[in-house]
Regions:
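Conserved structural elements of the adenylate-forming
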Residues: 33-39, 174-195, 203, 207, ...
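AMP-binding/adenylate-forming catalytic core of the ANL superfamily
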Residues: 65, 86, 103, 248, ...
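Conserved AMP-binding/adenylation subdomain of ANL enzymes
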Residues: 182-199, 207-247, 261
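Gly/Ser/Thr-rich phosphate-binding loop
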Residues: 220, 245-249, 259-323, 328-332
Length: 511
């Protein structure tokens, strides 16, 4: 198998003049970009970095972040990308846990980095429109003289270490080898039916599995990566229209924002022929609106994780809303009963069709990681009998398609019944007055937990109207919300996942 450095060189050799990356006014071909990557690779060596070392980035989606990523692959160095919003204590934990040797930041993340203990110990390079100082070099200084890159990495080298944003405790490092990354990139190309020269929007963060895969897969087909440093609907629409973007791969929240913008018009996105989403379930209403506005040739629901990139794929998401499809080309999946035997057991108890359980995935798959970084406690919880316990709940329908219903931790147990939030959210999303909805279980003396719907409205509506909407649907009565709370915003993570724990703890503002 080719390592990732050779994968990039393959793209340069195949079509050196093809436009590789766009970031504002910056436009580089594969041949031009390669010399920037090579110059940075040589800088790594000048600092004594070697295969197996790790470097830290606290950057938005910019040209520098993508260049650093590829330079690391060339050198066999692992990149440890963090959210640019990371606080000093988060930077310290991840940097110390990963034992990084060098860091890259930009203006927006500089103060938090310098306030961290890491900032006092590890050399930092300044990216973007920041001049170098006596103490800190500027990124642009490192690439003044272009150098051809050399693929010195290996498929067994760690390519990237993503830190998962756990709901409790410290984040877990997910080391992914170049072998698994290349397999995931090729799978992404195949499952999204990429053509040579595809153009996509580089807005999903490069500290997130979706963002990394977007970058890698574009190289495999000599595509163009149009960098959008942070989510801004108007800038995203401008980029789609100007650069004639052909494919979008976003979380549902960003699609929601796009359709809700006054600047959105079908004509502005007519170049987009393929849509994909991942990171969170998409409600039925948004799915149908997107299909009507874009008329995509392909509409992919991709279900996976940082640990194993692809679990399942549905290449026609509109045909059966809510279906995550069937196992991806490198995956095997099962649904096991929520209540299992002792952890020492060498077998699982499997759920029946239509029975909700926990989704698991075979760790022998080409896209899988091999265990968490320095976290045997996390391995013991999530790795069992050669399978990865995803922590997600779902079920197979009669045709063998997977429906993802939520997280094991999000399961509402009301009056002894297990209730998943996603089904209720999809039904409420179809009400014309509902802009966004999230469902959670709140403590109840009689039921244990009661189903509560948190609603952001697009037009006036009251609880009785929403309740009648649920009663007239096929939602069984015990799943019907017992309370409706109208909020100004639904709390979400930086990549658009609903933060139900904040709803449960009362961390929201009523409308």
């Amino acid at each position: 198998m080719l390592d990732l450095g050779r994968t990039f060189l393959q793209a340069v050799e195949r079509d050196p003049a093809r436009l590789a990356i766009v970031d504002g006014s910056l436009r580089l071909s594969y041949e031009e970009w390669a010399t920037h990557i090579g110059a940075l690779q040589q800088y790594f060596y000048s600092k004594g970095l070697a295969r197996g070392d790790r470097i830290l980035t606290v950057l938005q989606n910019r040209y520098e972040a993508a260049t650093i990523h590829w330079a690391c692959q060339m050198a066999g160095i692992a990149i440890v990308p963090l959210n640019w919003r990371s606080k000093p204590e988060e930077i310290d934990y991840c940097a110390q846990n990963a034992d990084v040797k060098l860091a890259f930041v930009e203006q927006i993340s500089l103060n938090n980095y310098l306030d961290s203990e890491t900032g006092k110990k590890i050399e930092v390079i300044l990216c973007g429109d920041i001049d170098g100082t006596a103490n800190h070099k500027a990124f642009n200084e490192l690439i003044k003289v272009g150098v051809d890159p050399i693929a010195n990495g290996d498929v067994e080298d760690i390519s990237v270490m993503l830190f998962t944003s756990g709901t409790t405790g410290k984040p877990k490092g997910v080391p992914r080898k170049q072998r698994a990354e290349r397999a995931a990139g090729i799978a992404h190309v195949a499952q999204n039916q990429y053509a040579m020269g595809e153009v996509t929007l580089g807005v999903m963060p490069l500290y997130h599995t979706m963002g990394v895969r977007t970058l890698l897969s574009l190289c495999i087909v000599n595509g163009t990566y149009v960098a959008v440093p942070r989510w801004d609907v108007e800038k995203a629409l401008d980029a789609i229209e100007t650069e004639k973007v052909t494919h979008l791969y976003l979380v549902p929240t960003l699609y929601h924002d796009m359709l809700g913008s006054k600047k959105f018009h079908d004509d502005r996105v007519k170049s987009v022929r393929k849509l994909g989403f991942a990171g969170a379930p998409m409600n039925d209403a948004l799915l149908l609106k997107l299909n009507k506005s874009f008329h995509p040739e392909l509409f992919v629901n991709h279900y996976g994780s940082s640990e194993i990139y692809t679990y399942t794929i549905n290449q026609n998401a509109v045909a059966k809303p809510g279906s995550a499809g069937k196992a991806g080309i490198n995956a095997r999946i099962r649904v096991i009963k929520l209540e299992q035997g002792p952890e020492s057991s060498s077998s699982f108890m499997y759920a029946e069709p239509k029975e909700e359980g926990q989704i698991i995935c075979d760790l022998a798959g080409d896209e899988a990681f091999e265990g968490y970084w320095k976290r045997p406690d996390a391995d013991a919880k999530s790795l069992r009998n050669g399978w990865f316990l995803t922590g997600d709940t779902g079920y197979f329908d009669d045709s063998g398609e997977l429906f993802v219903t939520g997280r094991v931790d999000d399961m509402i147990i009301s009056g002894g019944e297990n209730i998943s939030p996603v089904e209720i959210e999809s039904i409420l999303s179809l009400h014309t007055a509902v802009s966004e909805v999230a469902v959670a279980g709140l403590k109840d003396d009689r039921l244990g937990q009661k189903v509560v719907a948190f609603i952001k409205t697009s037009s006036p509506v009251d609880a009785s109207s929403l309740d009648e909407h649920c009663r007239s649907s096929d939602l069984v009565n015990f799943k019907r919300p017992r309370e409706y709370i109208f909020v100004k915003e639904i709390p979400k993570s930086p990549v658009g996942k609903i933060l139900r724990r904040m709803l449960v703890s009362g961390e929201y503002e009523k409308a």
